[in-house]
Amino acid sequence: MTLSSDMSDVLAEETDIDVVGEDDEPRAEEEEDEDLHGDLLPTSPQSSATKDPYKGTGGGGGRSALVKPPYSYIALITMAILQSPKKRLTLSEICEFISNRFPYYREKFPAWQNSIRHNLSLNDCFVKIPREPGNPGKGNYWTLDPESADMFDNGSFLRRRKRFKRQQAPELVLREPGHFLPASAYSYGPYSCAYGIQLQPFHPHSALIAFQQQQQQARQQPPSLPPMAAPALMPPAAQDLSRTCTFYPHQLSPAALPPSLQSKSSSALARSTFSIESIIGGDLNPGQCNSPKAAGVPVISRALVTFSSSQAAAALGGTLQPGTVLTNH
């Protein structure tokens, strides 16, 4: 009887060692801890003689047996998001999945919750989705970037190929200059900028290309010459009217002219009976128009707009004599 009981005890000890899989170093550390506790707490000789280092930790054996899973926080978050029906979860839902799946994190909660939050914010493979206005709750949703599908090696969450970095292809930058600019930059609420007037998207590449195109067009187009009238084809009276019409839109103050041009302009003004006052509605007699005071008033050739078709034909045909005054009808 005694031999069989002794053999069963030896087999039980060997089985426990194989299951736990601990080497000599942890055993030595546990023995040192037990020695420290033994110095502080009194023990009986029988208990010290029959004490087993693996059975002495019966109260905390379940807690110490919990092993941390060999997955990174990115892998844990990816697991949680992929198992959800809508492929999106909030921070609290991600932590709930990890706690339910792994007892180690359930025992350590909430010490690792901030680590999950930091990994969601700092890694480009996770995209934040704002909560819908009609969906009550707290916190935003998190989902996976579509381009991060091959982030893990052969679909194994134990190995990750490389850190995922969200990048934009160079050809898309040149093809769509305003791709990086958000739509909110060009709109004010649901009506957009100025209720439907869309601003052109600005990008340094597009601005540089537009500037180069403008320079090329400026080199290709010949400089345009100002139109010049042919004085030989017009009668003298029509020449005076054309000179008066083409001069005063550029310079409305005859006082600023040189003396030689002031005499010519005053003679042209004396032959015309139309002034600024006549256009506004004031009536001036011929004496006031021919006076020196009236000669200094700038004149706009209203006769080119208001005279009759018969007088225009006579002027162009050469029958209008110099000095003839055109009257307004």
From Swiss-Prot:
Region (Disordered): 1-63
PROSITE patterns, per database record: FORK_HEAD_1 (PS00657), FORK_HEAD_2 (PS00658), FORK_HEAD_3 (PS50039)
DNA-binding segment(s): 68-162
One Gene Ontology CC term in the entry: nucleus
InterPro entries per record: Fork_head_dom (IPR001766), FOX_domain-containing (IPR050211), TF_fork_head_CS_1 (IPR018122), TF_fork_head_CS_2 (IPR030456), WH-like_DNA-bd_sf (IPR036388), WH_DNA-bd_sf (IPR036390)
Acidic residues bias (residue ranges): 11-36
Superkingdom of the organism of origin: Eukaryota
Keywords recorded for this protein, A-Z: Developmental protein, Differentiation, DNA-binding, Neurogenesis, Nucleus, Repressor, Transcription, Transcription regulation
UniProt GO molecular function: DNA-binding transcription factor activity; sequence-specific DNA binding
Localization, UniProt: Nucleus
GO terms (BP aspect): ectoderm development; forebrain development; mesoderm development; negative regulation of cell migration; negative regulation of DNA-templated transcription; negative regulation of transcription by RNA polymerase II; nervous system development; neural crest cell migration
Summary of the function given for this chain in its UniProt record: Transcriptional repressor that down-regulates bmp4 signaling in both mesoderm and ectoderm. Regulates mesoderm patterning by repressing ventral mesoderm genes and promoting the expression of dorsolateral genes. Can also neuralize ectodermal cells directly. Inhibits neural crest migration. The transcription factors foxd1 and foxg1 mutually repress each other to pattern the forebrain.
Protein name as it appears in the record: Forkhead box protein D1
Protein encoded by which gene: foxd1
